UniProtKB/Swiss-Prot annotation:
Residues 1-21, 510-532 are annotated as: Disordered. It comes from Mycobacterium ulcerans (strain Agy99). It comes from the Bacteria. GO terms for molecular function: 4 iron, 4 sulfur cluster binding; metal ion binding; N6-isopentenyladenosine methylthiotransferase activity. Its cofactor is [4Fe-4S] cluster. PROSITE patterns: MTTASE_N (PS51449), MTTASE_RADICAL (PS01278), RADICAL_SAM (PS51918), TRAM (PS50926). This is tRNA-2-methylthio-N(6)-dimethylallyladenosine synthase. It is found in: Cytoplasm. Residues 163-399 form the Radical SAM core domain. [4Fe-4S] cluster 2 binds at C177, C181, C184.
Length: 532
């Protein structure tokens, strides 16, 4: 669907009255999941290929692009609040442009312009490649452009990219989701699952490694559903395809770390566990959403597994990788959840001993089956349960982290992970299991992207401390690339911290299929991965 809508709050002037394209700057603001971060890097790449340049830190951009999330009401409110903050500037600088894309744009469509008529471009999840052309059209025709495609026009990974990191990268293996979780709106916005061919994925990984990347994260709403038959999509999918992909990543020289997010417990198979344990560069870390420990609630959520199966997967993972860090997503206050149901969740959390959990309060989202269910719970009840769950998980996380004190860990040095690093004279990095470690680098020239070995000296629920100095330091091509300024740093809003090499401003996680996947939850999410 494509439409044009006249502006109500000022618009760009005629083409010959507008500054040259080469002078125009952009800023991309990202809300939501890792898939949105991946897509935002593509939006930035498209804009740079079209002649835009990234706005310098602390300056006003000529074009501001919002890549939105639709999973929670507070994500809606945050977007419209930020759009309102830009309205005065739009009135005084009509040549400035505002574009809104992503899941909320796909959902709200023309309603978005009714709420924020000063927006210039609205585009959806299926046509991000149209962004530069839509900006040009809005700028020259002086009318807002709304273009929402109903099917994927071009796989985002095939588009130009301006990555946030020189040392770590997202690699999408699929888009869309075939699950029907009752609380989740994402399948209706991103469509049915579409897989990339293994050859395309591995070619992208190789090209990233060739530029210095040492860590990749394979992305999908449900990565272990990967495996459509590319020869004949009507044939049964290859249920071993994801494990085969992990093993193939292990054959790429120079690729030191492989992560993935997120698997669905209903389709998690033992061949994936074997591939993780037997492939040296696949990290001993698993983020697998639980959502609830109550079988009755899981049934109402249409999650297609029960607590016993979930705990069985964890048991087999730990048997193969005793030191694996397992993290999860949990929703509190799903419609009809009783105290007995919630007690079952607490019991599973105690048994699972998660390293971290992203915990959320259920948020009623129009258009989802759960929004029509009876038994919507009072806010006070949900809040009280949420606080109990957070307290329990904080205790478990702290106990797990204290058990690592005195151990040596290998870190991929990161930038932006520790908000207090400047004050504490520390740097930060991620261990192979995804844990965040703040360490003292001393006077050595340690760079983001380098690999260091440190000994853990202290622990907190959300991070580890290593104040004993660096025991080993390996300079990498990734560190060289970072030092050479080959990375473009985006602006992120709303990203969880587990497993990410870069933590954005105002970290805030989403739920469902991933650590930043597709759930519908509200309130402050809690995790053991927040930067300190």
């Amino acid at each position: 669907m494509t439409s044009t809508v006249a502006h109500g709050a000022g618009s760009a002037g005629p083409a010959d009255d507008v500054e040259p394209m080469s002078a125009r700057t952009y800023q991309v603001r990202t809300y939501g999941c890792q898939m949105n971060v991946h897509d935002s890097e593509r939006m930035a790449g498209l804009l740079e290929a079209a002649g835009y340049r990234r706005a310098a830190e602390g300056t006003d951009a000529d074009v501001v692009v919002f890549n939105t999330c639709a999973v929670r009401e507070n994500a809606d409110n945050k977007l419209y609040g930020n759009l309102s903050h830009l309205a005065p500037r739009k009135r005084t600088s009509p040549d400035m442009q505002i574009a809104v894309g992503g899941c909320l744009a796909q959902k709200d469509r023309d309603a978005l312009l009714r709420k924020a008529p000063w927006v210039d471009v609205v585009f959806g999840t299926h046509n991000i490649g149209s962004l530069p052309a839509l900006l040009d059209r809005a700028r020259h025709n002086r009318v807002a452009q709304v273009e929402i495609a109903e099917a994927l026009q071009q796989f985002p990974s095939s588009l130009p990219s301006a990555r946030e990191s020189a040392y770590a990268a997202w690699v999408s293996i699929s888009v869309g989701c075939n699950n029907t979780c009752t609380f989740c709106i994402v399948p209706s916005l991103r469509g049915k699952e579409i897989d990339r061919s293994p050859a395309d994925i591995l070619a992208e990984v190789q090209s990233l490694v060739d530029t210095g990347v040492v860590e990749i994260t394979l992305l999908g709403q449900n990565v272990n559903a990967y495996g459509v038959s590319f020869a004949d999509p009507a044939l049964p999918r290859n249920r071993g395809a994801f494990a085969e992909l992990l093993r193939a990543c292990g054959d790429i020289d120079g690729l030191e770390r492989v992560r993935f997010t997120s698997p669905h417990p209903a389709e998690f198979t033992d061949d994936v566990i074997e591939a993780m344990a037997q492939t040296p560069n696949v990290c001993p870390a698993l983020h697998m959403p639980l959502q609830s420990g109550s079988d009755r609630v899981l049934r109402a959520m249409r999650r297609s597994y029960r607590a016993e199966r979930y705990l069985g997967i964890i048991e087999r993972v730990r048997a193969a990788m005793p030191h694996a860090a397992i993290t999860t997503d949990l929703i509190v206050g799903f419609p009809g959840e009783t105290e007995q149901d919630f007690a079952a969740t607490l019991d599973v959390v105690r048994q699972a001993r998660f390293s971290a959990a992203f915990t959320f309060q259920y948020s009623k989202r129009p258009g989802t089956p759960a929004a029509e269910l009876d038994g919507q719970l009072p806010k006070a009840v949900v809040q009280e349960r949420y606080e109990r769950l957070v307290e329990l998980q904080e205790q478990i996380s702290l106990e797990g982290n204290r058990a690592i004190v005195g151990q040596r860990v290998e870190l991929l040095v990161a930038t932006g992970e520790g908000r207090k690093d400047t004050l504490t004279a520390r740097m930060s990095g991620r261990a192979r299991d995804g844990r965040l470690v703040h360490f003292r680098a001393g006077d050595g020239p340690v760079r983001p992207g380098d690999i260091v070995t440190v000994e853990v000296t202290d622990a907190a629920p959300h991070h580890l401390i290593a104040d004993g100095g660096i025991l080993a330091h390996r300079r990498t091509r990734a560190g060289d690339a970072h030092a050479d300024g080959q990375t473009v740093r985006g602006i992120g809003l709303g990203m969880p911290g587990i497993g990410r090499p870069v933590v954005p401003v105002a970290a805030e996680a989403t739920s469902c299929g991933s650590a930043g996947g597709c759930g519908s939850a509200d309130g402050a999410g809690s995790s053991a991965g927040d930067p300190q």
